[in-house]
Amino acid sequence: MEVPGANATSANTTSIPGTSTLCSRDYKITQVLFPLLYTVLFFAGLITNSLAMRIFFQIRSKSNFIIFLKNTVISDLLMILTFPFKILSDAKLGAGHLRTLVCQVTSVTFYFTMYISISFLGLITIDRYLKTTRPFKTSSPSNLLGAKILSVAIWAFMFLLSLPNMILTNRRPKDKDITKCSFLKSEFGLVWHEIVNYICQVIFWINFLIVIVCYSLITKELYRSYVRTRGSAKAPKKRVNIKVFIIIAVFFICFVPFHFARIPYTLSQTRAVFDCNAENTLFYVKESTLWLTSLNACLDPFIYFFLCKSFRNSLMSMLRCSTSGANKKKGQEGGDPSEETPM
């Protein structure tokens, strides 16, 4: 999310807060390189998440884990659908109305889905910890209902948090080239935007602590299991359990860099504490780490495949059916060559 305090004077210059110095910035990276990178994510994410959604809607919601994964794939698909608007807007290929749409709707939706994904990764982490410590416990109907209610509550909370950001982005642009979404926000819209920024930071850091604590406990439990079964026939099962660490890998690759880069970047926008070169570096770091948050939509399918047995079995069954169907069709088309040979 962009901080209201910053003031960009044109597409290639930006003013350093608290000074009259204009800091030139080369936007070729953000107008060419990042649109290309987002295009790759869009096609890869659309294919993998469409397939994941198709599979998940064939699987019963028989555990909290599957319920949380289903919500995650919906969130990822919504995020992916915002990419084309960002690509066209950043590449300066759309009209001013497109930039207004991005600021008012798709950019808000992007962050809305990001923090939903972060929240569900936190819940999935808790679920995996409970599965590690109590592997034979099954989900009761009351637990499943609780997971569904919690999922609805997360969506409702984030929607109510994000909706004012859409409504309060209601100023008419004075210039066709809108360099910052904050120029379109009302006075209260800027205040609400800042409040939402703080709340989203809290959401991230809460889930960051959940991931750190749960994986510390999971590591401890897996080590105890290793010591107990060392040298026994259960060793292969322990190696399978290591797959659970894919969640923390995705969380740290996608979300941690952005939220650490965001702190000095926000400071550079609101206070004159960095020189021009440092400001530009922080800007590019912020844009790079923001792309990593988008990468989450392409990495989550690996979580589904490695950690969800029902998903993996359904996918393999689908692939086998497709392969056998293709072979059968090929056989029917080819037939027996002797039948086509004239006497």
From Swiss-Prot:
Residues bearing PTM Phosphoserine: S61, S63
TM regions (residue ranges): 34-56, 68-88, 104-124, 149-168, 192-213, 240-265, 285-304
Residues that, per the record, bind ADP: 99, 103, 111, 162-165, 181-185, 193, 197, 262-265, 269, 286
One example of a Gene Ontology biological process annotation: platelet aggregation
Keywords: Blood coagulation, Cell membrane, Disulfide bond, G-protein coupled receptor, Glycoprotein, Hemostasis, Membrane, Phosphoprotein, Receptor, Transducer, Transmembrane, Transmembrane helix
Glycosites: N7, N12
Keyword DNA repair: no
GO MF annotation, one: G protein-coupled adenosine receptor activity
Disulfide-bond pairs as recorded: C23-C276, C103-C181
Cytoplasmic-side positions: 57-67, 125-148, 214-239, 305-343
GO cellular component terms, A-Z: basal plasma membrane; caveola; cell body membrane; cell projection membrane; external side of plasma membrane; membrane; plasma membrane
Entry annotated with the keyword Hydrolase: no
InterPro entries: GPCR_Rhodpsn, GPCR_Rhodpsn_7TM, P2Y12_rcpt
Disordered: annotated span: 324-343
Topology, Extracellular side: 1-33, 89-103, 169-191, 266-284
Localisation: Cell membrane
UniProt cross-references to CDD domains, sorted A to Z: 7tmA_P2Y12 (cd15150)
Known role: Receptor for ADP and ATP coupled to G-proteins that inhibit the adenylyl cyclase second messenger system. Required for normal platelet aggregation and blood coagulation.
Alphabetized PANTHER family for the sequence: P2Y PURINOCEPTOR 12, P2Y PURINOCEPTOR-RELATED G-PROTEIN COUPLED RECEPTOR
Domain writeup: The transmembrane domain is composed of seven transmembrane helices; most of these are not strictly perpendicular to the plane of the membrane, but are tilted and/or kinked. Agonist binding promotes a conformation change in the extracellular loops that leads to an inward movement of the transmembrane helices. Antagonists can bind to an overlapping site, but block the inward movement of the transmembrane helices.
Family: Belongs to the G-protein coupled receptor 1 family.
Protein's recorded name: P2Y purinoceptor 12
Organism: Rattus norvegicus (Rat)
